Regions:
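Hydrophobic faces of well-ordered beta-strands that scaffold small-molecule active sites
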Residues: 54, 102, 129-131, 152-154, ...
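Alpha-helix-loop-beta-strand connector modules within alpha/beta enzyme cores
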Residues: 117-128, 180-184, 259-265
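Anionic-ligand binding region
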Residues: 165-196
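Auxiliary Fe-S-binding modules of radical SAM enzymes
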Residues: 1-23, 190-298
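Conserved Radical SAM active-site core
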Residues: 28-152, 160-162
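Conserved glycine-rich "GG(E/T)P / GGGxP" loop and the immediately following alpha-helix
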Residues: 95-121, 166, 172, 182, ...
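Conserved radical SAM core fold
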Residues: 74, 111, 135-138, 156-174, ...
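Alpha-helix N-cap and loop-to-helix initiation/capping positions
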Residues: 82, 109, 168-176, 212, ...
């Protein structure tokens, strides 16, 4: 499977770089790099619970979002290398700390290495694996995860290709995200939960409402409503937009999302009867951005 990395086509960019010798569009080589691995309390309640989600933040990214809160690791290269054995050990360490799941944040460009790590620890890892991504995926790559990942947590960022090109350098974002979310829902099946209300399988589609662009958000919610049964997926609507990184290059992004903008999108979700989560408006703060590291700290 690692032969994919010799001519990388894991993400829709299909940069075809030999990542054993060079960095791909994502900014990463074939060596796994992460910037944090800890219990994370700020995911959806059915993911974090009271014990926390065993979250592993991977360095690099196949998107170029101007408003990325994690820009230190997605764009600026922060992180440290791990072998696949060390990654497997990290998963088991998080499980031993009481994590409800192993939460892989921005994992797309490291899928082959993650699968190897999961194979190493498969006899000891007993909690669900969460694939937490920006939604810019290929169904063919997701198929590799069949039997390895139980929960998918994708973003669905944009409907309009003009916006996805402007803010994330990905004019083909929606077409790829749409196909991938269908694939994720097929792989995970309908949402299931344990006796504590912690998700064991299923897909939660996340959407961050951007200032000025509520109509694009509404189109996305309508698309979900027209393409999925209300019990097939869950929706998590986020209001945490805070101008950071290169968002200040765009006047329309130099503010937080208004209550009016957010509520009109909530109304659309409610119209289709989806179960899910609505984020508190107080979440829109830099205090919720975790600290990232350049070297092993545990």
């Amino acid at each position: 499977m690692n032969d994919i990395l010799k001519r990388c086509t894991l993400c829709p960019r299909e940069c075809k770089v030999n990542r054993y010798e060079h960095r791909g569009f994502c900014g990463e080589t074939a060596k796994v790099r992460i910037a944090r691995a800890e219990l994370h309390m700020w995911e959806e309640p059915c993911i974090s619970g009271t014990e926390g989600s065993g979250t592993v933040f991977f360095s690099g990214c196949c998107l170029k979002c101007c408003f990325c809160q994690n820009y230190e690791i997605s764009a600026e290269g922060k992180g440290f290398e791990l072998t696949e054995q060390e990654l497997a050990d990290t998963f088991l360490r998080l499980q031993s700390m009481g994590a409800n799941n192993i939460n892989l944040v921005n994992p797309t460009h490291f899928v082959p290495q993650i699968i190897k790590a999961l194979d190493i620890c498969k006899d000891k890892l007993t909690i669900p694996v969460v694939y937490n991504s920006g939604g810019y995926e290929k169904p063919q790559t997701l198929e590799l995860l069949r039997g390895y990942v139980q929960i998918f947590l994708p973003d669905l960022k944009y409907f309009d290709p003009t916006l996805s090109d402007k803010y994330s350098k990905a004019a083909d974002y929606f077409e790829n995200a749409a196909a991938s979310i269908h694939k994720m829902a097929e792989l995970s099946g309908k949402p299931t939960f344990d006796e504590k209300g912690i998700m064991q399988s299923g897909t939660i589609v996340r959407h961050l409402v951007l200032p000025t662009h509520r109509k694009d958000s509404i189109k996305l919610m309508e698309w979900l409503g027209n393409n999925f049964a209300k019990d097939e997926i869950m929706i998590s609507l986020m209001s945490q937009f805070t101008p950071v990184y290169k968002a200040f290059d765009y006047k329309e992004l130099c503010r937080k999302t208004s209550t009016f903008e957010y509520n009109t999108v909530i109304d659309t979700v409610n119209k289709y009867g989806f179960e899910g989560f609505v984020q508190s408006r107080t979440s829109a703060a830099k205090d919720f951005i975790p600290k990232f590291y350049d070297e092993k700290y545990y």
